[in-house]
Each structure stands twice: as C-alpha cells, then as structure tokens.
Amino acid sequence: MTEHCASDISDVSCPPRGRVIVGVVLGLAGTGALIGGLWAWIAPPIHAVVGLTRTGERGHDYLGNESEHFFVAPCLMLGLLTVLAVTASVLAWQLRQHRGPGMVIGLAIGLMICAATAAAVGALLVWMRYGALNFDAVPLSYDHKVAHVIQAPPVFFAHGLLQVAATVLWPAGIAALVYAVLAAANGRDDLGGRLCSR
C-alpha cells in the first residue's frame, strides 16, 4: 500500500519552477497598472486658493485641511500595495510544489516592479486629470484677485531618492515577512511541498 501511494505522488507532474516564478513576476507587474489606476481614482486632490495681496504680491494657501492630502494620497498607495503584497504572498504559498527562496525572490522582484508601475501609472493618470499646477502661472488681476485651483495628489511623500525607494521596496518587504511567517508556521522541512516529476 505504501509503495502504491509513493508512486502516485511521484507521478504528479507540475510546470517548471522557473516558468511559474516568471509568471508570478509578470502577473504582479501587470497588476501594478491596475493598482495605479485604482489609486488615481480614489486619491483625493488638493484644493487651494491663489490670491493677490494689497501690495500686489502673489500668495497661496490650502483650503481647510486639504494640505493633509499630501500625506493621505501616498498612504493610500502604500495601503493598496500592502494589501496586494499580503494577498500575493498567501496565493504564492498555495503553490505548494514551488515553495522556497526562488518564490520569495520572484515575489520581491514582481512586487517592486508592481510598485514602480503603480506609481508611474498613478502619477500619469492624475497628471492627465488635473495637470501640472504652477502657482505663479495662475492668471490673476486686480479685478479677480482670488482663484480656486486644484492640485494633483502626490504619489510619494517626497521626491527624494530615499522616499521613492522606500515606496518601491515596501511591498517586497511585506511579502517577504508574510512568506517567512507562513514558512515558520509550517512544521515540515520541505515546507509541505509535494513531490513532482520533472
């Protein structure tokens, strides 16, 4: 009976590990465009006013708590990427025969490409919707001293290299953490993977 079961398990065929990992990377890269589109749809724009003072100087200010959207919009992007990272890690863990460091590397690369794609698509879509705002170019006159303007939401907290890198690396770190927790919770040395015929 044991010999019969062992032969059945070894006869299970599965796709090559490299092909599956490349599929995960490409799938996550494509998902980045969807994440960027969703972010551009839900990210709140920033409403501001531009006006002339009595001395003729130009100034601007944000309405109410609109300046908080400089923080809220990038947090939305990180939140969407975090949800995707957790979901992708759990789904990748379900591919039992491909569990291991190769899958973690594939997840990390795919999620970094996904984050970069989401940021690029999101920035492009909000730029197409709201345009680039230059406070000094808003037309004002002494008859119309105040103008209401809308500024596109930012994708990143700042445009420094560190902030951009943190946003791109964030989902890869979350995915690695979730995958590590799943691996640590598994009591088997082979991570519970099934044997496949290659």
UniProtKB/Swiss-Prot annotation:
Keywords: Cell membrane, Membrane, Transmembrane, Transmembrane helix. It is found in: Cell membrane. The chain crosses the membrane at residues 20-40, 70-90, 107-127, 164-184. Signal peptide: none annotated. One of its GO terms (cellular component) is plasma membrane. It is a multi-pass membrane protein. To M.tuberculosis Rv1591. This is Uncharacterized protein ML1222. The lineage of its organism: Bacteria, Bacillati, Actinomycetota, Actinomycetes, Mycobacteriales.
